[in-house]
């Protein structure tokens, strides 16, 4: 092979490798998946890219926090207890969506917004497969 034919092949290989190296960095730029007490969760929903993140449908629970006028609230705190009253999850988020990886079952949720100024208690039922979605409107 001559020097002239090696150069384009080498350039193409380097370009491909640099593109592949950029993919993991791009994938990590989104909202992080966190963990509290062994439960995976994410705080998301700020911006179109976050709301369209393909990872979110895999979470069995999606709680969306909004004001009475429909605007998103970005500071929810959530505590989830199981049917026996045992706390299984608690977190403070900086985005209006709280996505939680809970096993199937019935849970009680205590949620606060606007730095604890408003609170709401409600039940959720998590089924096997699919996503339980609840919009919580706080005045």
Predicted regions and their residues:
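General secretory precursor processing signal
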Residues: 14, 44-47, 96
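N-terminal signal peptide c-region/cleavage motif recognized by signal peptidases
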Residues: 22-24
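Primarily secretory-pathway and cell-envelope proteins
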Residues: 26-76, 80-81, 113-139
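Short, acidic Ser/Thr/Gly-rich low-complexity loop/linker segments typical of extracellular
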Residues: 85-95
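Short, surface-exposed beta-strand/beta-hairpin micro-motifs centered on an aromatic residue
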Residues: 95-101
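Surface-exposed loops/turns
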Residues: 103-104, 128
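A short tyrosine-centered beta-strand micro-motif
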Residues: 105-111
């Amino acid at each position: 092979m001559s020097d002239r034919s090696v150069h384009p092949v080498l350039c193409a290989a380097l370009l491909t490798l640099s593109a592949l190296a950029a993919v993991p960095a791009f994938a990590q730029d989104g909202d992080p998946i966190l963990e509290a007490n062994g439960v995976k969760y994410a705080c998301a929903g700020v911006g179109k890219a976050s709301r369209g993140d393909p990872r979110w449908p895999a979470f069995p629970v999606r709680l969306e926090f909004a004001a009475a006028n429909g605007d998103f609230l970005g500071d929810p705190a959530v505590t989830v207890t199981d049917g026996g009253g045992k706390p299984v999850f608690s977190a403070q988020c900086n985005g209006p969506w709280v996505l939680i990886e809970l096993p199937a079952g019935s849970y009680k949720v205590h949620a606060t917004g606007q730095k604890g100024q408003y609170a709401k208690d409600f039940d959720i039922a998590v089924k096997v497969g699919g996503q339980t979605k609840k919009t919580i409107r706080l005045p």
